[in-house]
Regions:
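…primarily DNA-binding HTH/wHTH and HhH modules…
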Residues: 90-109
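Short coil/turn motifs that cap or connect alpha-helices
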Residues: 23, 34, 49, 72, ...
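Residue-level detection of beta-strand scaffold positions
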Residues: 39, 55, 73, 95, ...
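Append "Primarily bacterial transcriptional regulators
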Residues: 25-33, 38, 42, 76-83, ...
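Terminal helix-turn-helix DNA-binding modules in bacterial transcription factors
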Residues: 44-83, 105-109
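Short, Lys/Arg-enriched, Trp-marked, Pro/Gly-tolerant hinge/linker segments that flank
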Residues: 1-7, 15, 29-31, 44-52, ...
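Basic, amphipathic alpha-helical hairpins
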Residues: 10-22, 42, 46, 63-72, ...
């Protein structure tokens, strides 16, 4: 059951990945549960809050897109739901540990 819930949660976030207004309220609504129930379930299964779960899915996709080499950092930031590439870069560094441009250099080696 937990695995099904996680698959559904990932699918919903991926469907809304480019929507910078996608919120935990909307996420909970699409999961057919209250925001607090979603938070509790995700916390129990993954150890993450709903917002951290959304971020994890977004940054996983961002790293995939950056690795592909087909998109600029600005394009990737928009594709994963950030309306500002500078804010994306700040969050990326906080979550991944380096700036997107540094990440691209690392993966191209």
């Amino acid at each position: 059951m937990d695995e099904e819930l996680l698959k559904r949660a990932v699918s919903i976030v991926e469907e809304n990945i480019d929507n910078f207004e996608f919120s935990t309220d909307e996420f909970a609504q699409k999961m057919n549960m209250s925001r607090s129930n979603l938070h509790l379930k995700l916390k129990a299964i993954t150890g993450e809050s709903a917002i951290d779960f959304i971020r994890k899915v977004r940054f996983k996709r961002a790293t995939e897109l950056l690795k592909s080499g087909r998109y600029t950092v600005t394009e990737v930031s928009s594709m994963v739901g950030f309306n500002s590439s500078s804010y994306f870069a700040t969050c990326f560094k906080k979550y991944i540990g380096c700036l997107p441009t540094e990440y691209i250099k690392k993966v191209k080696g």
